[in-house]
Curated annotation (Swiss-Prot):
Gene coding for it: addB
GO biological process: double-strand break repair via homologous recombination
Taxonomic lineage from the root: Bacteria, Bacillati, Bacillota, Clostridia, Eubacteriales
The protein's name in its UniProt record: ATP-dependent helicase/deoxyribonuclease subunit B
Annotated binding of [4Fe-4S] cluster, by residue: C791, C1112, C1115, C1121
Cofactor details (free text): Binds 1 [4Fe-4S] cluster.
Length: 1158
């Protein structure tokens, strides 16, 4: 019976000493009971190390234990195993219920207890109390002595939570912290380890409960040997001492044996001038000794074992590490298992390390836990509950369906069914009760019902079958979950829903089998383990809270709190692989080469200052009152220092320290103080970067197949551009050509050198087939011509290949335009039927008619989107206001005008009134233009008939001569030309152009510094909604458009003003009859030019750019064309800004005639 302390700095061989001692004992006294006690996270590594050193004899004669395993052995031998141990899940669920029940009685934690994450904090505090032997009696005594009122209230409430938790827990359970207390009790009467020889390794500190267990073992064991990382004993140099934690541990151990009257067998000092691990490596030995030495000494010898690398970003950093690892394996004959990569935050680096190491074919194992929240089973359960509790939303439904767990929707065919279903659901706004109803709508319009084709009827039948398959079990589950029930009842309903109704557990088993058959060990373990975790959490929930009455949402809160406590550990899939992990979890054991990545300021050492429920000040007060708890943030800073020291002394032969200049989001980062320290203690070390590397690796670029291929591409490109490249690339190229798997890819590389982002023209025959209708005619609208002028390739994709966006159930700008146009057309018909004149309409007339028309439109189309929600009901009311205001303005415009509305929605190409515009091309083909004019007004004046076109727009629009010239705004001129050419058929005599104008449908918001009279408001509204476009420069015609226009005034309804002399003021909106003729002639030639390019198959990727306005910004096909203005072949069709007079000159030069005016 006695304690022996084995001490030494890092790398002195403490662990090796223990294993050698055990080996010697086995050889000399094979029947002795030998125990090696290590922290839980190191048991696996230690077992491997002992097995490697001692062989199979270790299995029979020695045990590697953690405190948890030790307790398990004692309970099995001496009783106590019957007490069920509550896991973290059950503990958290119980704390949740305790906090909920105490909620209204709490003051300090009343609000905090409802916050996400508080349960974890409360759980940690309870654990801390138990670890440090803080019980109810201790809390009572301490609270009475506390003078600080805030801390007193906090401790009172913590005591209530602590006591209530323990009261409910101990009805049949213990938690892991109780295990040590129970172990302490059982060891008193347990002879299991009597006479054993025990070595305790890898600990830097012990909790009071662990110290108590050690005390009991000391009384029964033959000997207890404890290793501590210490430079020298009995020499604590204050809290900044590097070894402060371990020296305090030594002090506590010495106090323990003194109090218990246990013999001290002395110290074994393993310290030497150069630690055992670094005997052959002076630089690493110098780092171990001087990293935290004050004052420090410098090592000025040659540097071979330390590299510092400054990376541009995380990707550059990990790529450097990957290349260097391959160099070590290739040139230094390292095994992958000899190499470790560590950092302070594995989660941050996991994705980039996985991607790059996989690309470089480096086998690796990431020592971390996986959060199970994203596993398909957990997503499935939460989505199923979300569906029924959140009114069958799209998001929850397709999360549920896309988990791959419903047998009807597994595999490729199942995925296609879900895609078809999703398209329909998005297109028709399926949610809520619509899932319960038969789907009957398949119309293309969101505003009107349409006749359904036979093909679409069959589709609907199939979709309804799918819907039934999905809805039936969910609906039954929904009915079963209604109202309040005990947690046990909810647990039973949920499990039966998953297992009996949907066979989810069977599906999981099939996935596990599939993963095993396909060597997907990680996935097989995940799917198998998550099922067991779910069942375990469900059972714990029933055991702990089974009789608690709650609703479904409360049940899911409890369940998810339990599930959140579980993480799955990944398993190593090979023996020879690089070990990657957090700095706190990886130990030295045989690590020849170590890469410490992410050594940035605030990251390593960590700058975390989370205090938890008890602040540093709280802990200080409690310590004064006799309660010693875990470290405060100040102490943690010094502990972090020791952690850094431990990490930097792991490598036996080679150490690489890297840091990126930018993080994953591109934010700049500074190097850690550790980097500066290394430069000071080893002044000869040179910091490397992408452009400066000290290790001359001639073949660095030849690594794994994919990265080498990438480097080969760069080399071939250089060679293609005339630059010299290394000779070995020829052999690399030949190797890829010889390999069947890579030959095709290398051909792609070669072709890529000749790549241009240009589209070859399609043949005229193909163009005809693509653009002709079923009558072998090419019929199109003006807007389509304008689309071609914007970008020929986008037109080809949209109208040639007929690519369509996924239909979404929403009210878009085109829908709004159609709706407004239709109501205005119906409004005109209505007043005609009632024999009303526009000029006679009152505000009340307008409002009543509009309200009636809109209500009928919505009422008569039950599937209309405007019937779908209160939001759209609001929109409907808003549309009524806008339309009422618009017709009132039109009425006022007509009162002030001698023009009369001749016709609304005048179609050409769709009726006998106006024929399609036929465009005969020079190549012999013909195009036919169809369209619909919103409104045509007519004026008979001095024996002449004048026509003006009004185009209704829901947005602001003005006539832009520059856009017209470039084919981007031709519509009104095309309509005008069609009208004039067909005027004898329409108005029974030859007509002349009067105007082409846009009318904005709106209810404008007026801005004014003061109150306005009703008349002023009316004038401002007329001004805001003034007609915009081109007018015939004829004072009589203009005056007929606004008969209120007087000399010296500006019109409120058209873009014109009159000088005091009575003639018209200068205005670019006014053009002469000859200019109208020029525009008509030019628009025809422009259309012929566009159509000729179209039929010749020109599909250039040539988007228009006008100032900062780029067509690509609003194009749905930019991801197809991959237009890139930085490529030599990709250029915008720039629309230069020109003065109107220059454009008129250009038009005149192109189509002839004379310009009589500006």
């Amino acid at each position: 019976m006695g304690l022996k302390i084995i001490y030494g700095r890092a790398g002195t061989g403490k662990s090796t000493f223990c294993i050698n001692q055990i080996k010697k004992k086995i050889n000399n006294s094979p029947n002795n009971k030998l125990i090696l006690l290590v922290p839980e996270q190191f048991t696996f590594q230690t077992e491997n190390k002992v097995l490697s050193a001692i062989g199979e004899r270790y299995v029979l004669n020695a045990e590697v234990l953690s405190f948890k395993r030790l307790a398990h052995n004692v309970f099995n031998e001496c009783g106590g195993a019957t007490r069920t141990i509550m896991g973290d899940a059950g503990k958290s669920m119980l704390i949740f219920k305790v906090l909920e029940d105490l909620g209204d009685n709490m003051t300090v934690f009343k609000n905090a207890s409802r916050q996400k994450g508080f349960i974890d904090i409360a759980s940690k505090t309870i654990t801390e109390f138990k670890k440090y032997n803080v019980n109810n009696e201790v809390l009572d005594l301490t609270i009475n002595e506390i003078e600080d009122e805030n801390l007193k209230m906090k401790m009172e409430e913590l005591k209530d939570v602590f006591n209530e938790f323990n009261s409910r827990l101990h009805e049949g359970y213990v938690d892991e912290e109780d295990q040590l207390l129970l172990l302490n009790e059982k060891l008193d009467g347990c002879s299991l380890y009597d006479g054993a020889e025990i070595w305790i390794d890898e600990f830097s500190s012990f909790t009071p409960n662990q110290l108590s267990v050690i005390g009991k073992l000391l009384k029964r064991a033959k000997s207890v040997n404890i290793t501590l990382s210490i430079d020298e004993v009995n020499s604590l140099k204050g809290e900044s001492d590097l070894f402060v934690a371990t020296k305090n541990t030594e002090k506590r151990l010495m106090n323990l044996i003194q109090e218990e009257g246990i013999a001290f067998s002395g110290y074994i000092n393993l310290n030497e001038d150069i630690p055992y691990r670094f005997k052959e490596n002076k630089e690493l030995a110098h780092i171990e000794r001087q990293l935290y030495a004050y004052p420090f000494k410098q090592y000025r010898g040659k540097n071979n074992s330390l590299r510092l690398y400054r990376a541009n970003n995380n990707y550059d950093e990990i790529e450097f590490v990957a290349k260097d690892i391959l160099r070590l394996v290739r040139e230094k004959q390292y095994r992958f298992k000899d190499i470790s990569v560590i950092c302070r935050d594995v989660d941050n680096y996991e994705k980039v390390v996985s991607a790059i190491f996989s690309e470089y074919e480096i086998p690796y194992y990431i020592d971390k836990k996986i959060d199970i929240a994203s596993n398909p089973l957990i997503v499935f359960i939460n989505s199923a509950v979300d569906i029924i509790s959140k009114n069958w939303t799209y998001e929850s439904m397709f999360k549920y369906l896309k988990t791959g767990l419903i047998k009807e929707f597994r595999g490729i065919e199942g995925a296609e069914l879900i895609d078809e279903l999703e398209n329909y659901v998005l297109a028709y706004g399926i949610k809520g009760k619509k899932w319960m109803e038969e789907w009957v709508n398949y119309s293309s319009s969101i505003l009107k019902e349409e006749e359904i084709s036979e093909e679409n009827k069959q589709r609907l039948e199939r979709l309804n079958d799918i819907r039934e398959t999905i809805v039936t079990p969910l609906d039954e589950f929904n009915k079963q979950c209604k109202g309040k029930k005990t947690l046990k009842e909810f647990a039973t309903i949920l499990y039966e829903f998953l297992d009996s109704k949907l066979d989810i557990m069977d599906t999981l088993d099939k996935y596990v089998d599939y993963f095993k058959e396909n060597d997907m060990a990680i996935e097989a373990k995940e799917y198998s383990e998550v099922r067991d975790i779910f069942i375990d959490v469900l059972e714990q929930a029933v055991d702990v809270l089974g009789n608690e009455v709650m609703d479904l949402n409360e049940f899911m809160k409890v369940l998810n709190i339990g599930l959140s406590q579980y993480e799955m550990g990944l398993i190593p899939v090979a023996l020879d692989q690089v070990n990657i992990g957090d700095i706190t979890r990886i130990k030295s054991r045989g690590t020849k080469a170590l890469y410490i990545i992410g050594v940035n300021d605030g990251v390593l050492p960590s700058a975390s200052k989370e205090e938890g429920i008890l602040s540093d000040n709280d802990r200080e007060i409690l310590l004064e009152k006799g309660i010693s708890l875990a470290s405060d943030t100040r102490t943690k800073i010094f502990e972090e220092q020791f952690l850094v020291y431990t990490a930097f002394t792991i490598a036996e032969e080679y150490l690489v320290v890297t840091y990126p200049l930018a993080d994953f989001e591109g934010k700049s980062q500074r190097p850690s103080i550790i980097v500066h320290r290394l430069k000071k203690i080893l002044p000869n070390v040179k910091e490397e970067s992408e452009g400066f590397k000290l290790v001359d690796d001639k073949y660095e670029k030849i690594s794994a197949k994919i990265p080498t291929l990438n480097e080969l591409m760069i080399a071939i490109r250089k060679n293609y551009d005339g630059a010299e490249i290394e000779d070995y690339w020829k052999y690399v190229y030949d190797w890829y050509l010889r390999e069947p798997k890579w030959k095709e890819r290398i051909e792609y590389v070669r072709k890529g050198l000749e790549y241009t982002n240009l589209e070859n023209n399609i043949s005229k025959e193909k163009a005809k087939k693509l653009y002709e209708d079923n009558k072998n005619k090419i019929s199109l609208s003006v807007s389509r011509l304008e689309r071609y002028a914007q970008c020929p390739f986008a037109y080809y994709i949209q109208y040639g290949l007929k690519a369509k966006d996924r239909k979404i159930y929403e009210f878009t700008a085109p829908d709004l335009g159609s709706f407004m146009h239709e109501i205005l057309d119906e409004f005109t018909n209505e007043i005609k039927e009632k024999d009303l004149k526009w000029s006679d309409l009152s505000k009340e007339n307008c409002r009543n008619i509009i309200n009636s028309l809109v209500d009928n439109q919505v009422k008569n189309n039950k599937s209309s989107i405007l019937n779908s929600s209160k939001r759209y009901s609001y929109f409907t009311d808003r549309f009524k206001r806008i339309l009422t205001k618009s017709v009132m303005v039109i009425s006022e415009q007509m009162k002030r005008s001698d023009f009369e509305i001749y016709k609304n929605e005048l179609a050409f190409g769709f009726s006998k009134d106006v024929n399609s515009i036929k465009l005969d091309l020079p190549s012999g083909e013909s195009f036919y233009l169809n369209g619909r004019i919103d409104r045509v007004d007519k004026l008979n004046l001095d024996g002449e008939t004048y026509l003006r076109i009004i185009d209704y727009k829901t947005g602001s629009k003005k006539f832009d001569l520059n856009k017209f010239y470039n084919g981007l705004q031709m519509q009104l001129l095309v309509y005008l030309d069609a009208l004039i050419n067909n005027s004898e058929n329409i108005v029974e005599n030859q007509a002349m152009p009067g105007a082409i104008l846009y009318f904005r449908i709106d209810d404008p918001i007026l801005k004014s510094k003061g109150d306005l009279t009703e008349e002023e408001i009316k004038s401002e509204v007329l001004k805001e909604l003034k007609l915009e476009g081109l007018l015939l420069d004829d004072v009589k015609v203009v005056k007929a458009m606004d008969n209120t226009l007087e000399p010296g005034t500006h019109s409120l309804i058209i873009p014109a003003n009159m000088k005091k002399a009575g003639d018209l003021g200068k205005n670019k909106a006014l053009i002469t009859m000859e200019q109208f003729e020029l525009l008509r002639k030019y628009v025809n030639e422009k259309m012929v030019e566009i159509c000729q390019n179209m039929i010749e198959g020109k599909i250039d990727i040539e988007p228009c750019k006008e100032n900062k306005n780029i067509v690509c910004d609003y194009c749905n096909y930019s991801h197809i064309c991959q237009f890139d203005s930085s490529l030599e072949d990709n250029r915008y069709k720039v629309i230069p800004k020109k003065k109107d007079e220059d454009i008129w000159k250009s038009i005149n030069e192109k189509v002839g005639g004379e310009v009589n005016g500006d």
